[in-house]
Structures are given as structure tokens and as C-alpha cells.
């Protein structure tokens, strides 16, 4: 057998060695890069899975996503999120939370952003276009309301003094033979209605017959808007695109569609559905306040207190407009003046005719406003600005409003504004942080009926994680991952 002698040059040996080194280097780089990619894939899959564990009732009832940090156990620890990441096979990756956002952070900004995104996608901007031209008028009503409250207080105090004088005059002549002359029976007194409102509250005269005011209440100290909240950290992108006015209008429409208010079953939105028939307002939230929007506006501890406050604000607005209508109606002004002459004669104060006339006009406007509120609470509409032909209460009917039990009712004008329209205006006039945090109060109270441990400041909406993995020998690879509900 012939032997073959082989040989290789030094150059070829070196070249072959370099080639092998290059090949193995490529393979090592591929292993490292593959490990990086696999780690990212594992982490992405895990974080998507974690954020898929959103609170179901929160999403279904309020269209807002959030992870219950305690997973309904009451153990609110950020480590729970890390454990869930590992559960979803994030491998040997080491996770460290660098940023976390809760629903209540920055006065509920995260909650509000999700609501706006939902409303914009679900309904679009056409929903609020018709209101953009009225916001300036709404802002003017704040001044009118304040001025009218001051004027009404002054007038009511004056009416009380007149009533005291009339009572004193009546007691002096009682049982005595007096010459025939002007008299004013108690049931004819036009000032009693305003006196009752001041002493017993507006609810005593406006609740429709057969209707009962809710007695539900909450402990304010435990609400998200009052208690010390868990705060997130880190920097996250914020939602942009809409101007402040449009955002307020859009958010308020969400509130009107989602939350309850006084006697909503009588209103034009009684079914709690949107245009497509999808149910929105959940009327069966048994543990929630019945008048949620009134709470969002006033922030008091009971339905009765909140309704009283909202209705009195509404009463002041109506009395302002009704007084203006009366002042222009010469026929009714003459009626008021004639009654003022009678009262001044009884008081032996002829110089008091003009002040008495103004008090009678205010009381008359107050009586008409009581009728307006009865209509509104009955689900009907009233003219935004009254005209003489739309006036309902006569001067002689004022005392009847005290004893009729709500049976004296005005007619539905078929046009004008309803109770929900006034709620919309009042919501627009409140500050954004205050409205948002009280919304979260209502969300918590409603969800407590099924999940007593639910807390809005323990609901995660955005998360930033720094991840670390050993990809090869002692080589570490670090990368950030961000995820959030937008």
C-alpha cells in the first residue's frame, strides 16, 4: 500500500485556526443574541398575561382597565406582580419595578385618561359638539347663583320679620271686635313658602308625591378622595389631543351615561342604554349611593344631603330667572303691589309698599321655582327662561304649595331643559381633580358589593420594569419593558 505524505503550511494552519475562531465566535454571538431575544419574548408574554388579569367588574361596569394589586386577597404588595411574571414563564429573568401607576395617581389622571379614550372611540366628538357653545353661559351661572343666594337670604330674613309682625298684629286683634278692614289670613300669606324652605330645606316642598328620598349613606373617611392613598412612581406618557373644554364635556357625558342620579327612572335616560341598546347605567348596584352624580357634585355623606344641596343650587338658578320674568310682567307686578299695599296697611307702614312688593316678587318666583323643580324631578322639562304664558303658579296658589304634598304640578313644556341638563352644567363647573376623585369614590362603593377589598389606589394601570438575565457565562443583559392600558 502506497503511503501518501501530507503537509500544511504555517499560513494555512493560522488561516484555519482563525476560520474556526470566527465560526465559533459567530455561534457564540448567535447563542447570546438568541438568549436575549428569548428573554424579551418571555418577558413580553409574561407582562401581556399579567395585564390580561384586569379587574373584570371594573372593566364591564366602568370601561376602565386595572390590575388589582392584591389579587382580591388584601395583600397589596408590588412583589405580587413579580411573582405573576415568573408564573407566566419569564424564566430566570430578574425583574425590578422602576415605575408603576395607579388609578388614583395625580388626582385620578390614569382613570380619566382611560375614560376619555373609551368615550372618544365609542361615541366620537359629535357627542359633545352641541354643548361647546354653551359653556361660557354655564360659567356665568356661578356668579348668578352666588348673587341670588345672598339676595334670597336677605329677602327671606326680611320675610321672616314681616311674618313675625303679622303674627303679632294678628294676636293683638284676636278675640277683639275690630272695624272691617284689610286682613291677611295665614293661609294667604305669600312668605310662608320661603320660610319653610329656609327652616326645613328644599326637599320639604319639591319631592313629587309618592316619591321617597334615598336614605343610603357612606363613611366619607374611607373614600379615595379623603383617605391617604398609595402613590405610584416613575414617568409615564400622558394622553394628548383634546382641548380642556372638550375633555371636560366628554368626561361628564361618561358620568351621565354610567352613574345614577335622583329619580333617574323617570328621566329620558331611564333605561340606562346607549344608542345601540348596550346597557350602561347599572341600576342594581345595591350597595352604591342611589344619587351618585349628586355625590360627585357635593361630596356629602348621604344621598339626602347631596340631593338637598344640588336641588338648592338649582332652586337658586330657577328663582333668578323667574324673578326676571316676573319683573317684566306688568300684570303680575300689579298683583304683587296690591298685596303689598294690603300688608303695609296691616303693619301700619305705608312707606314699606315697595320693599314688600319686591319680597312678594321673590317669594312668587320661589313658588314658581318649586314647581319647576317638581317637574324636573318627575322627569319632565321646563323652559330655560320663563315667559308670561308659561308661568304656572298664581299668587293665590303660593300657600297651597305648603300643604298639597306635591300634588300641584306644572305641565311639561315639551321643550327646554331637564334635570340631567342641569347636572351636566354643574359637573362642568366643578374642578377636574375633585370630580375625578369623587367618581372613584362611587366606583369603589359600587364594587364593594361583590369585592369588599377593592381599592382604586391599588389598581395598576401602567408598569415599567427593568429586566436582567445572564445570557452566557458571566455576561449580563439588561433591558426595560413598559406596558400600560391606554
Name each model-derived stretch.
Residues 56, 63-486:
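Long, compositionally biased low-complexity segments
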Residues 1-76:
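Alpha-helical assembly-interface signal, strongest on the long, hydrophobic N-terminal helix that forms
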Amino acid at each position: 500500500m502506497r503511503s501518501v505524505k501530507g503537509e500544511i503550511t504555517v499560513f494555512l494552519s493560522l488561516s484555519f485556526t482563525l476560520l474556526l475562531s470566527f465560526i465559533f465566535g459567530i455561534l457564540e454571538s448567535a447563542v447570546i443574541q438568541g438568549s436575549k431575544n428569548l428573554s424579551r419574548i418571555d418577558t413580553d408574554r409574561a407582562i401581556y398575561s399579567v395585564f390580561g388579569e384586569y379587574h373584570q367588574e371594573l372593566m364591564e361596569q366602568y370601561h376602565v382597565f386595572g390590575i388589582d394589586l392584591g389579587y382580591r386577597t388584601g395583600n397589596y404588595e408590588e412583589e405580587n406582580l413579580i411573582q405573576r411574571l415568573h408564573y407566566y414563564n419569564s424564566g430566570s429573568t430578574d425583574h425590578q419595578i422602576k415605575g408603576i401607576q395607579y388609578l388614583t395617581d395625580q388626582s385620578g389622571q390614569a382613570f380619566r385618561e382611560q375614560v376619555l379614550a373609551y368615550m372618544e372611540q365609542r361615541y366620537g366628538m359629535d357627542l359633545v359638539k352641541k354643548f361647546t357653545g354653551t359653556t361660557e353661559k354655564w360659567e356665568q351661572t356661578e356668579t348668578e347663583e352666588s348673587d341670588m343666594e345672598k339676595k334670597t337670604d336677605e329677602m327671606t330674613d326680611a320675610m321672616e320679620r314681616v311674618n313675625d309682625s303679622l303674627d303679632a298684629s294678628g294676636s293683638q286683634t284676636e278675640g277683639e271686635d275690630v272695624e272691617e278692614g284689610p286682613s291677611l289670613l295665614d293661609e294667604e300669606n305669600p312668605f310662608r313658602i320661603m320660610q319653610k324652605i329656609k327652616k326645613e330645606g328644599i326637599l320639604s316642598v319639591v319631592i313629587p308625591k309618592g316619591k321617597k328620598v334615598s336614605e343610603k349613606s357612606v363613611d366619607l373617611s374611607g373614600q379615595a378622595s379623603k383617605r391617604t392613598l398609595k402613590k405610584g412612581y416613575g414617568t409615564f406618557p400622558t394622553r394628548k389631543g383634546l382641548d380642556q373644554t372638550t375633555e371636560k364635556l366628554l368626561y361628564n357625558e361618561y358620568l351621565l351615561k354610567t352613574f345614577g342620579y335622583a329619580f333617574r327612572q323617570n328621566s329620558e335616560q331611564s333605561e340606562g342604554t346607549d344608542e345601540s341598546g348596550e346597557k350602561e347605567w347599572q341600576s342594581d348596584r345595591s350597595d352604591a349611593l342611589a344619587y351618585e352624580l349628586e355625590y360627585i357634585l357635593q361630596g356629602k355623606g348621604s344621598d339626602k344631603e347631596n340631593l338637598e344641596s344640588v336641588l338648592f343650587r338649582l332652586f337658586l338658578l330657577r328663582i333668578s330667572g323667574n324673578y326676571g320674568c316676573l319683573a317684566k310682567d306688568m300684570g303680575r307686578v300689579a298683583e304683587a303691589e296690591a298685596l303689598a299695599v294690603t300688608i303695609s296697611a296691616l303693619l301700619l307702614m305705608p312707606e314699606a309698599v315697595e320693599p314688600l312688593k319686591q319680597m312678594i316678587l321673590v317669594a312668587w318666583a320661589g313658588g314658581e321655582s318649586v314647581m319647576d323643580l317638581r317637574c324636573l324631578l318627575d322627569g319632565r322639562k321646563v323652559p330655560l327662561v320663563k315667559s308670561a304664558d308659561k308661568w304656572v303658579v298664581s299668587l293665590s296658589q303660593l300657600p297651597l304649595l305648603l300643604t298639597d304634598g306635591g300634588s300641584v304640578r306644572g305641565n311639561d313644556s315639551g321643550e327646554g331643559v331637564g334635570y340631567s341638563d342641569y347636572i351636566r352644567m354643574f359637573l362642568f363647573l366643578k374642578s377636574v381633580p375633585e370630580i375625578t376623585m369623587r367618581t372613584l369614590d362611587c366606583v369603589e362603593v359600587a364594587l364593594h358589593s361583590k369585592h369588599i377589598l377593592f381599592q382604586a389606589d391599588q389598581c395598576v394601570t401602567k408598569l415599567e420594569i427593568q429586566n436582567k438575565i445572564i445570557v452566557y457565562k458571566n455576561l449580563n443583559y439588561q433591558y426595560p419593558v413598559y406596558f400600560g392600558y391606554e
